[in-house]
Amino acid sequence: MINKQKVNKIVNLIGFLSLNLQRKIQNIKVMKRSNIKVMKRSLIVGTYLLSLVCSCASEGTLDNGKPLSLMEDSKNMVEMAQLFAPLSMVALDEKQSDKLKWISKIDYVNGRYYVLGGLERGKLITFDSKGKFLMDIGDIGHASGEYVQASDFAIDKANNRIAILEAPNKVLLYDMNGKFLFEKYFKKISFWNIAWNNNEYILSTNNFGIQEKDKLLYVYDENFNLKNSYVDNLPYTIGMSNVLATPLQVDGNDVNYIDPVTKGIYTYKSKVADAQRTYKWLLPNPMPDKDYVHYKTFAENQYRYDFILDAVVDENRILTSYKRGDYMFVNLMTRSGMSKTFGHIDVSLPKLIKGSGRYVFLAIRGREYLKDKAYFTKYKKDINNNDGYLIFKCKLK
């Protein structure tokens, strides 16, 4: 069993490795078996490294939630236009885009794009509605108001503040012009994602439980006083930071946590101050919880089982990408669990990035967009190979 001191030493390493694993998983080419083999090699490398620092996993007792069936097989090919209705597209400032090797989160608030990404370490960058660079929020460093790596962020719309999470134990607050205000340290809990909604901050441990009593979701007021915590962590588990781009998603008055380990969606409802599992994915051959959260067994058994890759909830739609057998599938369904579109997808599915509003963002480089005919065609004439990141603001079909 890993003791608490050892956990504190390895937590940053786990975050770094799992972030790199997330990037590998989210850029899988999902059609051919040869591409599946590439995915397998990538997953093995990431999970093997993580297995060197982790051990001990155990299943927890959870509520059932409404079933979302992914049991059907299909030979149908799905195109992006069947899943997303693009509302707008902007090309990010070329100089700034060149500094972004990856993008992990996007939001659009009051005419500004907030983009979390970087070369090696994450940084929060702002752009105007046309993609012109405005400013960085905070700097990378160790001084007051600086962060080693921005892991996640949230926009506090009530108090006009920007909260940046430096996992696992610090949140930095800035005003909307990037002026540093204050920071909050968490001594005994490891957090990996943050959201703001209804004047509350919601932080998730992503099943990274150090103590048996740790919870999955913690709710704080505007001054970061703890209000309550919900949903038991999987006991004695060292869970990796979630491989989804945005596992913690604002959904109107609710906040959803997407958990591929337990194959569920957990919903925090601020109006009733409660959280529970609201949905449960059903797969033909699901990976057991104990294998999913233990990196070594995940690497050894990933070929044998089906598992969730990514998901986003947007109003009355749920979009899921998942491995089933030897192939990658997507399934767009209603909240009642009725499938609208599902099958293989013949394009590299970008990360599904849920903003705080009713939008899903896709970040695609110009050359990738032009290379693949399956992407939205109506913007082709406006793009060239030298364009960096293109940000598509979409609704689910």
Provide a role label for each language-model segment.
Residues 60-92:
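Blade/loop signatures of beta-propeller domains
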Residues 112-117, 160-166, 199-210, 251-266, ...:
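Short beta-strand elements that form the blades of beta-propeller/WD-repeat-like
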Residues 96, 138-146, 186-192, 233-238, ...:
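Short coil/turn segments at the loop-to-beta-strand junctions that recur within blades
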Residues 88-120:
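Beta-strand-rich domains and repeat architectures in extracellular enzymes and scaffolds
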Residues 93-97, 132-159:
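Blade-loop segments of beta-propeller domains
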Residues 101-105, 148-153, 189-196, 238-247, ...:
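Repeated scaffold domains used in trafficking and secretory/extracellular systems
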Residues 167-198, 203-211, 230-235:
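Asp-box/WD-like beta-propeller blade repeats and closely related beta-sheet repeat scaffolds
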Residues 278-300, 335-357:
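Conserved blade-ending motifs and adjacent loop-strand segments that build the rim/top face
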